[in-house]
């Protein structure tokens, strides 16, 4: 029987090659508490920092992803860790990989590699997966760079979080102002990604790892990564989907219709997303944002190694479906069934 402890992010990740990944306020303790409460109320044994956690206090339900936090959870009987945190090479959790523990989430070393949006896009491109044209700009290049792309462009952090720090620019002046602002702020480091803007429909696709799942009471074995139904995004702000920490996704996202889900374009982008999941050898769900060009062809423009897993488990969180949960509902999963199927994919080192 699993004794599950949920980890949250307690501190900023280290700067890597001059690039800083920003930290979400609370370090995903909100989704961690959602997960813990949903599992606990459905009979799964959850280890918490205190004996009687308060439903309104996120930190009562989750452990910090520090050496002390992990040891505290183990001392209370945890044998499985849900890695609901930002991972990277030499993360504290790696020191516990030889302790015969189980883990739910990605391998830190892989997240460290594929959190780099430019590197990941190049991996996908080299494997014939369609991604937008892009180029890197450093703070040293601010007045000297040569633009190899045509406007409009999207300016985005290399190791960003959701749509935070992402802006659309339509001309040279807007680009200069955006670069100057992002570099002077220093929140994302001294390198950013410029990407060709695609003006078609935006969708997001959750890719599940290979494994055995229970869907509508039937056990199904997937030999390769597979896709949950695509979700379309709308109500963009300045052509960019707003960060879901500011606007609940149920207000700007909807699973595609049955006819849309059967379309050639969607089936084609599914195959690209599944291939991406295979290339990355994922151990847990990832979410891939895709956008169509003027001809309806979809390109993969953002791969998220740690999709949000919020859910309406607590009374005050009833509008907190994640994009992945919207997809999961389409195949008949509740929030608990999504989480239970993620537990089924737990791994040991």
Regions picked out by a protein language model, each given a short descriptive name:
Residues 1-103:
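ATP-binding N-terminal substructure of ATP-dependent carboxylate-amine bond-forming enzymes
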Residues 2, 100, 110-201, 209-214, ...:
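Active-site nucleotide/adenylate-binding loops and adjacent lid/helix of ATP-dependent enzymes
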Residues 35, 39, 120-125, 328:
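Structural element of the ATP-grasp superfamily
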Residues 46, 80, 103-104, 131, ...:
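Hydrophobic beta-strand scaffold residues
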Residues 86-90, 109, 233-236:
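Short glycine-enriched loops at secondary-structure junctions
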Residues 170-264, 268, 292-299:
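Phosphate-binding site of ATP-dependent enzymes
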Residues 260-349:
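ATP-dependent carboxylate activation and anion-phosphoryl transfer catalytic cores
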């Amino acid at each position: 029987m699993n004794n599950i402890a949920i980890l949250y992010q307690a501190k900023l990740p280290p700067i890597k090659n001059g690039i800083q990944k920003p930290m979400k306020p609370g370090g995903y303790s909100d989704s961690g508490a959602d997960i813990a409460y949903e599992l606990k109320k459905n009979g799964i044994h959850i280890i918490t920092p205190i004996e009687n956690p308060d439903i309104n206090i996120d930190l009562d339900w989750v452990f910090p992803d520090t050496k002390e936090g992990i040891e505290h959870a183990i001392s209370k009987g945890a044998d499985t860790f849900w890695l609901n945190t930002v991972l990277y090479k030499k993360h504290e959790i790696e020191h516990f990989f030889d302790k015969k523990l189980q883990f739910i989430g990605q391998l830190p070393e892989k997240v460290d590699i594929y959190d780099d949006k430019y590197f990941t896009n190049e991996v996908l491109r080299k494997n014939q997966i369609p991604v937008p044209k892009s180029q890197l700009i450093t703070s040293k290049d601010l007045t000297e760079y040569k633009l190899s792309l045509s406007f409009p462009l999207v300016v985005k952090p290399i190791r960003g979080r959701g749509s935070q720090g992402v802006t659309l620019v339509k001309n040279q002046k807007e680009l200069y102002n955006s670069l100057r602002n992002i570099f002077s702020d220093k929140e994302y480091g001294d390198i950013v990604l410029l990407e060709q803007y695609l003006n078609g429909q935006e969708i997001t696709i959750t890719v599940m790892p290979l494994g055995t799942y229970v869907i509508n009471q039937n056990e199904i074995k997937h030999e390769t990564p597979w896709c949950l139904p695509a979700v379309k995004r709308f109500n963009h702000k300045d052509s960019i989907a707003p960060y879901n920490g500011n606007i609940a996704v149920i207000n700007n996202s909807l699973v595609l219709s049955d006819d849309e889900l059967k379309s050639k374009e969607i089936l084609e982008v599914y195959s690209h997303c599944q291939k991406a999941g295979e290339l990355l050898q994922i151990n847990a769900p990832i979410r891939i944002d895709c956008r169509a060009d003027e001809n309806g062809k979809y390109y993969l423009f953002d791969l998220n190694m740690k999709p949000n897993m919020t859910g309406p488990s607590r009374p005050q969180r009833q509008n907190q479906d994640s994009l992945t949960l919207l997809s999961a509902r389409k195949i008949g999963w509740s929030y608990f069934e999504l989480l239970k199927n993620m537990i089924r994919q737990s791994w040991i080192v």
